[in-house]
Structures are given as C-alpha cells and as structure tokens.
Swiss-Prot record:
Keywords: Cell membrane, Lipoprotein, Membrane, Palmitate, Signal
Record protein name field: Putative lipoprotein LppJ
Cell compartment(s), UniProt: Cell membrane
Lipidation (S-diacylglycerol cysteine): C29
Gene name per UniProt: lppJ
Membrane topology: Lipid-anchor
Segment forming the signal sequence: 1-28
GO cellular component: extracellular region; plasma membrane
N-palmitoyl cysteine-type lipidated residues: C29
Length: 187
C-alpha cells in the first residue's frame, strides 16, 4: 500500500488527535495503573522491559489481521505494515501497526457491525483496553487494539491494528510501509 501525501497527512492528523486525547488520560492514570514497564519510563503502555523483536512485533498484528480478513470475509483488501513510535519524539519503543482497507458491502454501519460480530466470535473484546480511548468501533485481544472507521474513499472501511509498545529497535528513520496485502488474502 504506497504512501500518498493524503495518507501521510491523515496518519499524522490521527496520531496528533490520538496523542492529544490520550496524553492527559495517561498522565492522570499512570500512578494507579499496574502494568510492567521499563524502569524510568513514565509511559504505562511501554513494556520495553520485555521487548519484542521486529518479527515478533510484526506477527503480533499481522496474524490477527489475517484472522479478521478470513472471519469477516473481507473483500478487496489492501494492507500495509509499519512500525509506529509510542512517543511523540519518534524514539523507541515502537509498536507494530497494520493499516488495512476493505470494500464496504451495503450500509457501512451494518457492515462494520458484521465485522465486529465476526471478531467477537473469535475472542476479541468489545471496546478499547482499559485507559485507552478511540473514535469508531474498537476491539482488543492479546495486546492488539483494532479500530474501524470509514476510509477517505467512503466505499471502503479502514481498520488499524496496533500492537504493544515492546519493540526497542530504533525505527526512527523508517518511512516505509511494507505492503502485506498478499499475506492477508487467501488465494
């Protein structure tokens, strides 16, 4: 899935909005949330004390994406993988992120509920993990958060799957998204 200027702007806008919404919440919850994190880190989602390799971080989000595509029988899927910094400096730790678009069939609200139901039947939990807030339909499972919304082209839905902040490799200068469409679509 090649990056276009519009895709980059959308991603940066979403990240900025998410950061603006999450930072005040994390600041207030950091002292009461018990979650292992790196010594000296003030980010409760940073579990880099138990790091994931690049391959593990990628598998953490690619495997669930494959399952979702199959379970919901998503059509015309396009998908890309990248590493996303878990802080606003672009420094480690990173999380694996899958962004996928899929063709909406019929009413988008009804179709999103179809996808949601398929995910719930495969063990996903409705809503975001405790302490996280998203717009759109959000589910989580095994450290992965999936958020669904309309894509810019309203004939498509978009799902973003984010893994845990446990990859400590420096991806600061990685600007590439790896096309993983063929890994998600069954021949």
């Amino acid at each position: 899935m090649p990056h276009s200027t519009a895709d980059r702007r959308l991603r940066l806008t979403r990240q900025a909005l998410l950061a603006a919404a999450v930072v005040p919440l994390l600041a207030g919850c950091a002292l009461v949330m018990h979650k292992p994190h790196s010594a000296g880190s003030s980010n409760p989602w940073d579990d880099s004390a138990h790091p994931l390799t690049d391959d593990q971080a990628m598998a953490q989000v690619v495997e669930p994406a494959k399952q979702i595509v199959a379970a919901a029988d998503l059509q015309a899927v396009r998908a890309g993988f990248s590493f996303t910094s878990c802080n606003d400096q672009g420094d480690p730790p990173y999380q694996g992120t899958v962004r996928m678009a899929f063709l909406l069939q019929g009413d988008h609200d009804a179709y999103f509920q179809h996808v949601r139901a398929a995910m719930l039947s495969h063990g996903w939990i409705d809503g975001p993990p405790p302490g996280q807030y998203f717009h759109g339909i959000t589910l989580h499972k095994n450290g992965v958060t999936a958020n669904m919304s309309l894509a810019l082209d309203h004939s498509y839905g978009e799902m973003i799957l984010d893994g845990e902040c446990r990859n400590t490799t420096d991806h600061h200068h990685d600007d590439e998204t790896t096309n993983i469409t063929n890994q998600l679509v069954q021949p």
